[in-house]
Each structure stands twice: as C-alpha cells, then as structure tokens.
A protein has these predicted regions:
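Ankyrin-repeat inter-repeat connecting loop/turn
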Residues: 49, 83-84, 114-117, 147, ...
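Start-of-repeat signature of ankyrin repeats
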Residues: 23, 56-57, 91, 121, ...
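Ankyrin repeat structural motif
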Residues: 35-43, 69-78, 103-112, 133-142, ...
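Sec-dependent signal peptide recognition
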Residues: 2-10
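Ankyrin repeat A-helix N-terminal signature
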Residues: 29-34, 62-69, 97-103, 127-133, ...
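Ankyrin-repeat-protein effector appendages
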Residues: 20-29, 143, 176, 185-188, ...
Length: 219
C-alpha cells in the first residue's frame, strides 16, 4: 500500500512539473523565434518577463538578445516587471549580452530603463570591445562606463579589444583615456596581449600612444 502511495505522489509531482514546464518552454521558444504574438499572450496570462530557461540558466530576455529577436526583446525591456540586473550562470546581464551582440537599440533601451553600466568584474564595455562595436562603446562611455574596468583576471576593455583584434575600438578607448600601461594577472600590457594574439599592428598603435604620453616624474 505504501508503495502505491509513493507512486501516486511521484506521478502527481511529475504532472505538476510538466504543467509548470509548459509555459516556460513556450516563452523560451517565443524568445528564440521572435514570436511577439505568443510572448504577449504568455505575459498577458501572468507569466513573468524574468522567466529563466532551466536548460541554460539565461533569462528569456538574454535568449531574445542572443538570437536577435528584436520584437520580443523590445517587449520584455518595456515590461515594468523586468529585473534589469538578473544574471546568467556566467554572470552576464542583459546589457552585456546586448553589447556583445551589437544591439544598439537594446543597449539604449536598457540604459534608459536604468541598467547598471559598470559592474564589478566583467562589464558591458568589455563586451562591446570584444565585438568591435565603436558606437556601443561610445554610448557606454557617455553613460559613465569605467574605461579601465578590470575583469577577474585583470583584463581591461582595451586589453580585450587588443586580444580580439578590434583596432577601431582600441583606438577609441585610447582617445578616451584608457590606461595602456596597466597589466593583467599575467603581467601583460594591452600591447603585449595584442602581439601575442598576432595583432602586431594594434600593438604598435598602443606602443605609439604610450610613447606620446608625458613622462611621469617622481616628486
């Protein structure tokens, strides 16, 4: 008899889990496919814009941004229930994802909603540097992004631009005042990182910038 009770309880639990998973699966799929109509329907039924994909740990907004689902992303960002600073398992926020995917519209919308531009560790500016988007990097700097923000391994946005071969962003950051003399946890400068990644031309640009700086004199 006790076995039958346990089986019945397990069956009820599985049915409950399946029922909960249905709408979650649907909203994740809507985010992936940019199904604006389905998203509106699900949100109208009370499903949260902060729903997390149980498979990836990403929010549906992050999924929409990653997949280029502009309509769904815009609707989620406009939802006043949206929690702007939700993080994926790797620490990414929606603003970071938007910067990496070069989604200028989403970056502007998220900042207008109050998204944090500079966080401890990895920042949206690192991601804009990695993707090579000078427009988004400029927007972030205009909204007071810390230009020398350091990742957990002490990589600055300039170092990321150098490593990824993004010369335009590297030059933008240098013009904006990035400190080219900083070193990461391997004791490498941005120039050395560029050379190691076989981007000697970017390394040369950084070296020329350093050479033109005023010499620091001890008091």
């Amino acid at each position: 008899m006790s076995n039958m009770i346990r089986i019945a309880a397990l069956s009820a639990l599985l049915l409950s889990s399946t029922a909960c998973a249905g709408p979650v699966h649907d909203i994740v799929l809507a985010a992936q496919m940019d199904n604006f109509t389905q998203l509106k329907k699900l949100l109208g039924k009370g499903l949260s814009p902060n729903t997390i994909d149980p498979v990836t740990g990403e929010t549906v907004l992050m999924i929409a941004l990653r997949e280029g689902s502009q309509g769904v992303a815009a609707e989620l960002i406009a939802d006043q229930r949206l929690e702007l600073e939700q993080q994926a398992p790797n620490g990414n926020t929606a603003l970071m994802m938007a910067a990496f995917k070069r989604n200028k519209v989403a970056v502007l919308a998220l900042i207008a909603r109050g998204a944090v531009v500079t966080r401890p560790g990895w920042t949206a500016l690192h991601y804009a540097a990695a993707s090579g988007d000078t427009d988004i990097a400029t927007i972030l700097l205009e909204h007071h992004a810390y230009i020398d923000a350091a990742s957990p391994s002490q990589l600055t946005p300039l170092m990321i631009a150098a490593r990824e071969g993004q010369r335009d962003v590297a030059e933008l950051l240098l013009r904006a005042g990035a400190d080219a003399r900083l070193r990461n946890n391997e004791n490498l400068t941005a120039s050395q990182i560029a050379v190691r990644a076989n981007y000697e031309a970017i390394g040369a640009v950084i070296d020329r910038h350093i050479a033109a700086l005023p010499i620091k004199r001890s008091p």
